[in-house]
């Protein structure tokens, strides 16, 4: 059983926590997420044009890039995380350019060497994923695909083909941090996806509070929170780890106790 499979095999939903690499003391921030009870870590790769991200994560990208964070730095952060936390699943999330600049095979091999479990590439449509996805799968890395409220029955098979680890359901069309969609809409769309795949379905975008996270955990296999955590890094700087652990615990407790 892989680390991702193990995280989603529990009787409760998995809590997935996101922060941006290179923003603040990333190692301490990641450790705080684990200490707070996160089941899966998503580590954002900073990019100059993060089109799917809202103001909070865009600002985190700017802060990280201003410090000179590179793809190699992200991989080093991942490698050091894996050494400290051998059992916690780690997913890289970002955009195609940094992932394929040196070639998909290079990136996939580096991810494998650093103990990365999965990769979410936001801006490669599944119909155009002829190189990165196969390279990741060949290296034993799960290519995790995004489904949205506009992913209809005709397109869903393309999204699911070659997807591994879990399906990331984007609960609102648009950018991260937006207002959450209605729970009944989320429930029906998650159920629709699950009728077509045995993969777990995790829901993200617009989830900010323990109450929201707990409600979604009753209808999905996982809950992803990013902007609310990233905002703490921007607001509290060196004091962010304590704040992150506190919010992560509240979110994880709500997710784990929802069923």
From Swiss-Prot:
The gene is trpA. Tetramer of two alpha and two beta chains. InterPro entries: Aldolase_TIM, RibuloseP-bd_barrel, Trp_synthase_alpha_AS, Trp_synthase_suA. It comes from Erythrobacter litoralis (strain HTCC2594). One of its GO terms (molecular function) is tryptophan synthase activity. It catalyses: (1S,2R)-1-C-(indol-3-yl)glycerol 3-phosphate + L-serine = D-glyceraldehyde 3-phosphate + L-tryptophan + H2O. The active site is at 42 (proton acceptor), 53 (proton acceptor). This is Tryptophan synthase alpha chain. Belongs to the TrpA family.
């Amino acid at each position: 059983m892989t680390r991702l499979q193990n995280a989603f095999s529990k009787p409760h939903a998995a809590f997935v926590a996101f922060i941006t690499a290179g923003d603040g003391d990333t190692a301490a921030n990641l450790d705080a997420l684990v200490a707070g009870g996160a089941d899966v870590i998503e580590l954002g790769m900073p990019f100059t044009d993060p089109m799917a991200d809202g103001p909070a994560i865009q600002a985190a990208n700017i802060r990280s890039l201003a410090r000179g964070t590179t793809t190699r730095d992200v991989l080093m952060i991942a490698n050091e995380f894996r050494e400290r936390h051998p059992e916690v699943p780690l997913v890289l999330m970002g955009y195609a350019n940094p992932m394929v600049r040196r070639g998909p095979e290079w990136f996939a091999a580096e991810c494998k060497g650093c103990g990365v479990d999965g990769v979410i590439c936001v801006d490669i449509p599944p119909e155009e994923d002829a190189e990165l996805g196969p390279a990741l799968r060949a290296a034993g890395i799960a290519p995790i695909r995004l489904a949205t409220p506009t992913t209809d029955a005709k397109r869903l098979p393309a999204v699911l083909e070659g997807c591994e680890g879990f399906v990331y359901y984007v609960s609102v069309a648009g950018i991260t941090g937006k207002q959450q969609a209605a729970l009944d809409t989320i429930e029906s769309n998650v159920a629709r996806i699950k009728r077509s795949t045995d993969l777990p379905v995790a829901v993200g975008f617009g989830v900010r509070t323990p109450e929201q996270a707990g409600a979604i955990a009753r209808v999905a296999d996982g809950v992803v929170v990013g902007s609310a955590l990233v905002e703490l890094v921007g607001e509290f700087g060196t004091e962010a780890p304590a704040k992150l652990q506190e919010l992560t615990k509240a979110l994880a407790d709500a997710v784990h106790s929802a069923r």
